[in-house]
Amino acid sequence: MEIRILKSESNYLELEIEGEDHTLGNLIAGTLRRISGVSFASYYQPHPLSDKIIVKILTDGSITPKDALLKAIENIRGMTSHYIDEIKGLTK
């Protein structure tokens, strides 16, 4: 995975994530939309055969797009940890 910043402003961030597809894009965008201060979050895959996605984040100024992205990643990490614990509990 390689991440490049395509555009960065005080309340807007556009990233290209190489080596990923809809699986990660949908998870990140959906999680971002639940964060207070995020006005818009989306992703798209420029071409069906490419293995890269473009993520766009727009905030209302109460949080920076970078902080919103970091918070989304922490939320995803927490969700996956919870699911791992639940699955481990099922196998006992």
From Swiss-Prot:
Cross-referenced Gene3D superfamilies: RNA polymerase, RBP11-like subunit (3.30.1360.10)
CDD domains: RNAP_RPB11_like
Superkingdom as given in the UniProt entry: Archaea
UniProt key word DNA repair: no
Parts of the chain that traverse the membrane: none
Subcellular location: Cytoplasm
One term under GO cellular component: DNA-directed RNA polymerase complex
Catalytic activity of the protein: RNA(n) + a ribonucleoside 5'-triphosphate = RNA(n+1) + diphosphate
Enzyme Commission number(s): 2.7.7.6
InterPro entries: RBP11-like (IPR036603), RBP11-like_dimer (IPR009025), RNA_pol_Rpb11_13-16kDa_CS (IPR008193), Rpo11-like (IPR022905)
A GO molecular-function descriptor: DNA-directed RNA polymerase activity
GO biological process: DNA-templated transcription
Assigned keywords, A-Z: Cytoplasm, DNA-directed RNA polymerase, Nucleotidyltransferase, Transcription, Transferase
Keyword Transmembrane: no
HAMAP family the UniProt entry points to: RNApol_arch_Rpo11 (MF_00261)
UniProt family annotation: Belongs to the archaeal Rpo11/eukaryotic RPB11/RPC19 RNA polymerase subunit family.
UniProt xrefs under NCBIfam families: PRK01146.1-1
Subunit structure: Part of the 13-subunit RNA polymerase complex.
Reported function: DNA-dependent RNA polymerase (RNAP) catalyzes the transcription of DNA into RNA using the four ribonucleoside triphosphates as substrates.
This protein's name: DNA-directed RNA polymerase subunit Rpo11
